[in-house]
């Protein structure tokens, strides 16, 4: 094995890019770039029943959108291809035939029914289900009998007895398995397709992978892959198994959990920024030295240390993601924020697709009001709802404000001041509020809060004069008089 670090992300084209898979890709990418090595994408598409049309391209597109690039893959080629497992069957055949020849693998003619019966009997005896090995040493005559019955064989790896398979995991430390607890496992299915563990071991060796960084759900696969390496006398790559991502209930993130958005495509559609997602995912199970939490891609590459991968589960905190994204939104100029948010207002039917110069100016002012507090693009629809509705609803907090004794005087006086305005500008609106203060003697919260609640329906919000300007003179006066 050479000195150059070579790592891979190996997606199956069975669906869209999940946040967990994006993290696996990102950590491998950062490790390769930090070490001046190579990052490879290999498509594991042998499970044809689960593959979906466009799944492969979708994975690649959203990795690119996040800001991840690669050195070798189906789209850019490379000297260790093909990079789709479905195109490597002739390669796998050479290696499983070698194992058969050496007696390190054998043909198994057991039917699914026989295997199921064996499993049930083992469970009934309180044993861990595993293949008994009853076809380990079939005679030629026995094999011919099964063939005559029309049985098709799978090929099983002959697991050595009484061995300890140990490896030093980058994240977890020393891990070991007893070979007697594993059982002879299938390396080629009855239809001639290699199984995951066999194909992965062959590919990782031939593509010269030095490290294999993946989720901890792969730990149980590792001893099988190591035994395949050992059977061929190959150097074994260094393994690192990243901890699970958990939700706020500390349960493993499940694709069925609808309380958390889990696919990169959905975040893009909602108007999250790729740089912010890159930053957030980069801290899911990895921590830098110090307290800083915001890093550019270049900074991540510089500081990434694979030995700082967390040993405890990574908490997916939606509030934290919104905070991180907000920090990036704040850095955008107004044109960029308009580009991020306007399509969401249009999709929601709040504004038209063809805007006059006057309408464009109004929308820009509206979006500018919420620039600092905006967490993601689509949030603009919810934040600005009060500007697009005839009837505003008041929550309990707002109702409590409107029940204070000074409210009728403040609101009626302010309505009269607004009616007098010829130019409805923030400066003139601000002057009108000051005039109400002077005339009624009410100031501070007693003055501002009833006006804000009456006109916006909210107890908190952006600059009041600017908000009232955008609501419009007629609507603002109507809302004041409706209380």
Swiss-Prot record:
It comes from the Bacteria. Its main location: cytoplasm. It is an enzyme of class 6 (ligase). A motif ('KMSKS' region) lies at residues 252-256. Binds 1 zinc ion per subunit. InterPro entries: aa-tRNA-synth_I_cd-bd, aa-tRNA-synth_I_codon-bd_sub2, aa-tRNA-synth_I_CS, aa_tRNA-synth_I_cd-bd_sf, Glu-tRNA-ligase_bac/mito, Glu/Gln-tRNA-synth, Glu/Gln-tRNA-synth_Ib_cat-dom, GluQ/Sye. It catalyses: tRNA(Glu) + L-glutamate + ATP = L-glutamyl-tRNA(Glu) + AMP + diphosphate. It is found in: Cytoplasm. One of its GO terms (biological process) is glutamyl-tRNA aminoacylation. The keyword Aminoacyl-tRNA synthetase applies. Keywords: Aminoacyl-tRNA synthetase, ATP-binding, Cytoplasm, Ligase, Metal-binding, Nucleotide-binding, Protein biosynthesis, Zinc. Its EC number is 6.1.1.17. Its cofactor is Zn(2+). Catalyzes the attachment of glutamate to tRNA(Glu) in a two-step reaction: glutamate is first activated by ATP to form Glu-AMP and then transferred to the acceptor end of tRNA(Glu). This is Glutamate--tRNA ligase. It comes from Bacillus subtilis (strain 168). The gene is gltX.
């Amino acid at each position: 094995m050479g000195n150059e670090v070579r790592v891979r992300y190996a997606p199956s084209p069975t669906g869209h890019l999940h946040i967990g898979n994006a993290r696996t890709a990102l950590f491998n990418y950062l490790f390769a770039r930090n070490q001046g090595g190579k990052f490879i994408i290999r498509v594991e598409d042998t499970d044809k029943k689960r593959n979906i049309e466009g799944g492969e391209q979708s994975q690649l597109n959203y990795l690119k959108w996040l800001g991840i690039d690669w050195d070798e893959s189906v789209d850019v080629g490379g000297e260790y291809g093909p990079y789709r497992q479905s195109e490597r069957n002739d390669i796998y055949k050479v290696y499983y035939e070698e194992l058969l020849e050496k007696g390190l693998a054998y043909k198994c003619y057991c039917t699914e029914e026989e295997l199921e019966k064996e499993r049930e009997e083992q469970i009934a005896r309180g044993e861990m289900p595993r293949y008994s090995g009853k076809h380990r040493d079939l005679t030629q005559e026995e094999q011919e009998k099964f063939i005559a019955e029309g049985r098709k064989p799978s090929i099983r790896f002959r697991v050595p007895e009484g061995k300890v398979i140990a490896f030093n995991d980058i994240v977890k430390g020393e891990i070991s398995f007893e070979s007697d607890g594993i059982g002879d496992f299938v390396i080629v299915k009855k239809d001639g397709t290699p199984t995951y563990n066999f194909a992965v071991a062959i590919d990782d060796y031939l593509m010269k992978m030095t490290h294999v960084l993946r989720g901890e759900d792969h730990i149980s696969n590792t001893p099988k892959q190591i035994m395949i390496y050992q059977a061929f006398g190959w150097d074994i790559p260094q393994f690192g198994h990243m901890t699970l991502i958990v939700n706020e209930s500390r349960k493993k993130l499940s694709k069925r959990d609808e309380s958390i958005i889990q696919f990169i495509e959905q975040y893009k559609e909602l108007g999250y920024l790729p740089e912010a997602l890159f930053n957030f995912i980069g801290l899911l199970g990895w921590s830098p030295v110090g307290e800083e939490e915001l890093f550019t891609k270049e900074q991540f590459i510089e500081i990434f240390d694979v030995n700082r991968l967390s040993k405890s589960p990574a908490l997916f905190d939606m509030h934290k993601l919104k905070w991180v994204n907000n920090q990036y939104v704040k850095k955008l100029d107004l044109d960029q924020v308009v580009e991020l948010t306007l399509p969401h207002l249009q999709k929601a039917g709040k504004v038209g697709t063809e805007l006059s110069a006057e309408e464009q100016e109004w929308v820009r002012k509206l979006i500018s009001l919420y620039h600092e507090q905006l967490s993601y693009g689509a949030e603009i629809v919810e934040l600005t709802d009060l500007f697009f509705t005839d009837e505003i609803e008041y929550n309990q907090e707002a109702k409590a404000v409107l029940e204070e004794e000074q409210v009728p005087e403040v609101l009626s006086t302010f309505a009269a001041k607004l009616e007098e305005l010829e130019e409805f500008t923030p400066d003139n609106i601000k002057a009108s509020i000051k005039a109400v203060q002077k005339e009624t003697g009410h100031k501070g919260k007693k003055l501002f809060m009833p006006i804000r609640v009456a006109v916006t329906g909210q107890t908190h919000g952006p600059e009041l004069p600017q908000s009232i300007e955008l609501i419009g003179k007629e609507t603002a006066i109507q809302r004041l008089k409706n209380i």
